Amino acid sequence: MKKQLFWAPQNEIPSTLWTANERSWLTHPGSLTQRLRKTTDGQIQHHLLREVFDAPVDEETQLLGISQPELALIREIEWRYFESLWVAGRVVIPKKTLEREGSPLNHIGERSLGDILFANAKFTRGDLEFRQITADHPYYFYVKEIANGSCIWARRSLFYFERDPLLVSEIFSPALFLESSVSND
């Protein structure tokens, strides 16, 4: 199978790279949080692994239009269905977005960011981009426990609070695709 080694919009991803179930999950335009909860009848668990001001990786700074060594709030999370990792996530929120008047992003705490983004009309979402995560990509760290040579897909999109961006990246475990079905939309 040919590797997709760069971020690309859906129309540039060969249709043969995804099964129908993978396509359904990866291209889902709504709240992934809500879809995961619905699919598992609320049994999925959201875990905040880390929330810290740190330097984003190069591809994140470029996409967000911030300069190195500017720090941003980085949130790393995972969604587990019982013990099975289904989705790992990384959110990068530049300081200017956090500091914007009225921003609800300053005190997210243990909550899922999706509960905030899709409940507030001041947030808009940019286009989704996709890529395969290989061992040399910085996001591989989040899924190395389950990779085992599997094809790992990720998606990312910019959200905007008014005009200020934040980046949401989601890495999908093969277990999600195996343990769920297209009918669980």
UniProtKB/Swiss-Prot annotation:
EC annotation from Swiss-Prot or TrEMBL: 4.1.3.40
GO biological process, one term: ubiquinone biosynthetic process
Keyword Disulfide bond listed: no
Catalytic activity: chorismate = 4-hydroxybenzoate + pyruvate
Keyword Lyase: yes
Domain of life: Bacteria
MF terms (GO), sorted A to Z: chorismate lyase activity
Keywords: Cytoplasm, Lyase, Pyruvate, Ubiquinone biosynthesis
Chain sites annotated for binding substrate: R75, L113, E170
One Pfam family hit: Chor_lyase
Location of this chain's protein in the cell: Cytoplasm
Pathway: Cofactor biosynthesis; ubiquinone biosynthesis
GO cellular component: cytosol
Enzyme class: lyase
HAMAP family: UbiC (MF_01632)
Job of this protein: Removes the pyruvyl group from chorismate, with concomitant aromatization of the ring, to provide 4-hydroxybenzoate (4HB) for the ubiquinone pathway.
Protein family (similarity comment): Belongs to the UbiC family.
Designated name of the protein: Probable chorismate pyruvate-lyase
Organism: Coxiella burnetii (strain RSA 493 / Nine Mile phase I)
Source lineage: Bacteria, Pseudomonadati, Pseudomonadota, Gammaproteobacteria, Legionellales
